[in-house]
Amino acid sequence: MVNKFRGDRAILEPGLKTLEQLCGIPVAGVIPYTHVDIDDEDSLTERFGRSMERKLLDIAVIRVPRISNFTDFSPFERYANVSLRYVDQVSDLHQPDMILLPGTKSTIADLRWLRQSGLEAAILKAADAGTLIFGVCGGYQMLGRTVSDPEQVEAAGVTEINGMGLLDMDTEFRGEKVQTQTQGIFHGVEGLLSALNGLAYEGYEIHMGRSRQQMPALSGGGNVYGSYVHGIFDAPGIADTILRVLCARKGVSFDALATFDASGYKERQYDLLADVVRGGLDMPFVYRVLHREV
């Protein structure tokens, strides 16, 4: 298969025949270069190098060294007047309207890094000042009182570490990983994000730790929240509701941000990718390969 081909495919045909002769296997197709906005691989993203410009609403994502599933926050970056900045040092944090703590491949190691970098102290100071704090998966675990690892699933030599103490919960790592699709309706949410009550959410969980005092989708209140659900901001109305809260606190109009359906946009982008792939590949041949008929 030839991927991301630019130009007239007819010009490429002689080369495809030569390739088949040299390799002794058929070319399954040619997929043209197409601009499709889909989620990046964690290690291949260009988002981390983007501008640190602060816009009408400013959101800071803490860029921990072992960051994962950072695309949880993509719904926020598709508003023209919202800046989503990835921050890995205190001097770049400033005073954002919301701080997001992402998932991580190692909660304990990245929690230690937060302490050593001074970012934990900066986050605690921001939380004390009323800034909205939201952690997802590993970032959620960091917000609790303790993270324990009695079986040393994550790190050898570490059985327990203090969390930030912003949420009334404790996390314990176990050998079996939680992997599940989840959906539901927000209820019982208190504090700044109480407007989420009644909205539907869906996503997935994939994590090693279990947290006591955990609500189904959203824990916390006041101005600090956390969730194990990846994709929690994608469903219609959720990102909008959070941004409306931030706008009201800042005294600016939500209309200046422009409404955006993240879930619908993502579906349209994947549909576009599927159409391009189907149009470029010999799909009957691909299916025969999948069924081991070739």
Give, region by region, the residue ranges found by the protein language model.
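N-terminal Rossmann-like NAD(P) cofactor-binding module of classical short-chain dehydrogenase/reductase
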Residues: 100
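Cysteine-nucleophile active-site neighborhood
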Residues: 104-192, 200-201
